[in-house]
């Protein structure tokens, strides 16, 4: 990923996804915001761009189903992941103070994740859902009685005043983003005997028989493969029969290396339906927003 490339991401600009795309592709010749996750996948699949950046999981809200479903039904693979600690900032146009605010705008998820703070400090404020946190930030520029719950990138780029920073009800809010491409990543370098720094995401359908799921999980256990995440997904929305489920799994290791390679061979031998969604370097920890809001306009 060293040569200049064009990269698509779930827009609009100045969102958390935009910040992640900038961090991962600082060399990109162009970052292209697209309106939906489906559109990002289409752009990569059709060769318009080599990479796309989309959210896949939030530590509070859970899985982003549109991303997972697109990976299951499409041809793209995960090539990289990035975790971002989410920071919700209450901001308004310059010279607006908390006493002026009569309504607060943001994406519905952000409003819900800041509910306790809003109940305590703005119980009478009208809470207005917006299409995105970045759009909310733009909308308050023309409204002297409005504040937005917005990401730091939007606050900085739009020159908003910070009314209060870090207003989320929980301080462990993080979102996991993935880079999707036509190929996943090769195995990462490591010292002999060192654990793999890679992660593999896959989906499987267990044999439709008594103990089928237990048998599949037993294959991973027998191969000493650690599963870091497992989630069921109804097949009915994926052109499958009603009341049957696929299981989306994150496993330590790379699909081309032992012991995960042997586990995948074992699943194939037992007749389990398996699709690898990608092997890629594991994100070691959530990364806080790189932006410094100390230069943003303070407000009382």
Residue ranges and their predicted role:
Residues 1-300:
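Domain-level signature for soluble enzymes in the chorismate/prephenate branch of the shikimate pathway
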């Amino acid at each position: 990923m060293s040569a200049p490339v064009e990269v698509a991401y779930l827009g609009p600009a100045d969102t958390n996804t935009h910040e992640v795309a900038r961090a991962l592709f600082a060399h990109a010749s162009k970052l292209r915001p697209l309106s939906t996750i489906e559109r990002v996948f289409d752009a990569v699949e059709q060769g318009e761009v080599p990479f796309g950046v989309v959210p896949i999981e939030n530590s509070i809200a859970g899985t982003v189903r549109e991303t997972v479903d697109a990976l299951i039904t499409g041809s793209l693979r995960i090539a990289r992941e990035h975790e971002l600690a989410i920071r919700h900032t209450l901001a308004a146009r310059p010279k607006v103070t908390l006493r002026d605010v009569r309504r607060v705008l943001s994406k519905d998820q952000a409003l819900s994740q800041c509910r306790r703070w809003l109940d305590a400090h703005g119980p009478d404020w009208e809470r207005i859902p917006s299409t995105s946190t970045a759009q909310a930030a733009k909308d308050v520029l023309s409204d002297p009685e409005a504040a937005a719950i917005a990401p730091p990138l939007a606050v900085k780029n739009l020159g908003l005043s910070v009314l209060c920073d870090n207003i989320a009800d929980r301080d462990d809010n993080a979102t996991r983003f993935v880079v999707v491409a036509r190929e996943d990543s090769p195995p990462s370098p490591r010292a002999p005997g060192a654990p793999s720094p890679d992660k593999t995401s896959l989906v499987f359908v267990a044999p439709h028989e008594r103990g089928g799921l237990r048998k599949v999980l037993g294959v991973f256990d027998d191969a000493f493969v650690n599963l870091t995440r497992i989630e069921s997904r109804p097949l009915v929305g994926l052109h499958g029969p009603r009341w049957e489920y696929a299981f989306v799994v994150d496993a330590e290791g790379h699909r081309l290396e032992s012991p995960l390679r042997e586990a995948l061979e074992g699943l194939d031998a037992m007749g389990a339906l398996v699709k690898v969604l990608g092997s890629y370097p594991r994100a070691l920890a959530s990364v806080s927003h790189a932006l410094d809001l100390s230069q943003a306009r303070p407000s009382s």
